[in-house]
Structures are given as C-alpha cells and as structure tokens.
A protein has these predicted regions:
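A conserved catalytic-core signature of glycosyltransferases
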Residues: 53, 121, 126, 200-202
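A SAM-dependent methyltransferase catalytic signature shared across enzymes that methylate proteins
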Residues: 129-146, 208
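Acceptor-substrate binding/catalytic loop of class I
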Residues: 113-130, 146-149
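Conserved SAM-binding loop
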Residues: 1-108, 130-132, 205-209
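A C-terminal cap/extension of S-adenosyl-L-methionine-dependent methyltransferases
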Residues: 44, 110, 147-209
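Short, hinge-like loop/turn segments at secondary-structure boundaries
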Residues: 36-38, 113-116, 160-164
Length: 209
C-alpha cells in the first residue's frame, strides 16, 4: 500500500526496525524514496520487501509486532495470510488485524457496483464473530477490540452513492480525513468517537500469540 501505517509507526517509535511488504515494485521504490527522511529523524531503520503476504520471507517467531491492516478482504485465501502473520510473530507478542466493518461495507456494496468490482478491491465482507473463530483456530488470544474511522464510513458511503466519483466536497473531506489520521487535523473528533462503536469503517482486533 502507500505505507501510511509504517509512517505512523515511525512517528511513535525510535531505534526500531520496521519492515513493509508489497507485491508491487513501483510501490516499494516509491516508499524507499519517501522513507529516507524518516530514517534520519527517528533513527528507525526500514526494510521493504517485494513479496506475497501469503508466503513471507521472514524467519519464524522473529517479529515483536505484526500489523495486517485492510488486507484480508482483498485476498482469495485469507487464512494463508493469517497463518503467515502467526508464523513470523514472536510468542507472547502482539498482532493487529483490521478489516472493513460489516455495516458500512455492506452499504457501500449495496449502493455501488463499481465499489464491488474495483480491480484489486474487496472480494468479501467479514463478520466479527466469524473472524474471532478464525483467530481461535490459530490459538491467537483476542485481548482488545474496537472500531475506528466512522467519518471514513461517511466518506465512502457518500462516494458509493455518487457512482464512486469524487466531487469537490468529497475530495476535500478525504484530504482532511487523511490529515486527521496523522494528527494534523481535528474533524469533529467527539462526534466520530460517538459513532465509532457502531459505524466505524474499520474493525480492529488486538491478538496475542
């Protein structure tokens, strides 16, 4: 992806080795250029691997934290991804999984065929209880759960109703939402926190191996 989660981690951590994986050579090259500035600022080191998340070239039981954010809904055999994330995670360490929440995602599918048929887009909608059973199969212990980004639900539903086209209002809203994710803007945070429990765009699962 565009590396926003790596950037967010980089702002919060120091002296850490942060690894990103993407199957696109173009994306990896772009990220290598973008992250050179972050390396100097935070004394973090970054490594970018070209590869498939269903077969990760990282040693078993080697990672202190694994983040798999908004990935499982894109891949045909998502269980292979979960198994790989589990394999590389150190015992006792934490895995963060996030997927689109059922309600807002269902509305986007309902309102827009284009949303459903986007190349490389979402091919399934997860239900919370189903995913919890998948985690149990791997003996991952769920210790925290919440929903986030309710305002992103608003953005994507409005865009779905607009045949996936971005008008000026939606463009401005999206720019502000991205800034908010990095703490650079404050958009009705109180309202969003009130909406998150039932309308958050992402469901976040915190799991321990």
């Amino acid at each position: 992806g565009n590396g926003r989660h790596l950037k967010s981690l980089g702002f919060r951590l120091t002296n850490a080795k942060i690894i990103g994986i993407d199957q696109s050579i173009e994306e990896i090259t772009k990220l290598q250029n973008e992250f050179s500035e972050h390396i100097c600022k935070n004394q973090n080191s970054y490594e970018f691997l070209i590869g498939d998340v269903r077969s990760i070239e990282i040693e078993d039981n080697s990672q202190d934290l694994v983040i798999c954010s908004e990935v499982l809904e894109h891949v045909p055999n998502f269980r292979d991804v979960l198994k790989e994330c589990y394999r590389i995670l150190k015992p006792g360490s934490v895995m963060l999984i996030s997927v689109p929440s059922y309600l807002p995602e269902s509305l986007c599918w309902k309102y827009s065929k284009e949303y459903m048929q986007t190349p490389g887009g979402h091919i399934r909608i997860f239900k919370k209880e189903f995913l919890k059973e998948c985690f149990k199969e791997l003996d991952l212990k769920l210790f925290k759960y919440h929903r986030e980004h309710a305002m992103h639900s608003v953005y994507w539903i409005l865009r779905a109703r607009n045949n996936m086209q971005e008008n000026e209002f939606l463009k401005s809203l999206h720019e502000l939402l991205v800034k908010q994710m990095f703490g650079q803007a404050n958009i009705s945070l109180f309202i969003e926190k009130m909406l998150n429990p039932f309308f958050g765009k992402s469901e976040c699962f915190y799991l321990r191996k």
